[in-house]
Amino acid sequence: MAVKLYDKVILKDERHGVVVEILEPGVAYLIDIELPGPDWDTIEIRDSDISKVLR
């Protein structure tokens, strides 16, 4: 899956987030997960965790 910096993604667990750093292209990323209100959580994910790239 082609994922670029600042792409919006939907994870397989249905959480939405934005790619904020590409750790290893096509393998691992840091994303900011949207939380209720103005909060977010930054997590590391693998390419296999992504369900869909929204761009």
Regions found by a protein language model. Name each.
Residues 2-55:
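Basic/aromatic-rich interaction segments and small domains that mediate binding to polyanionic partners
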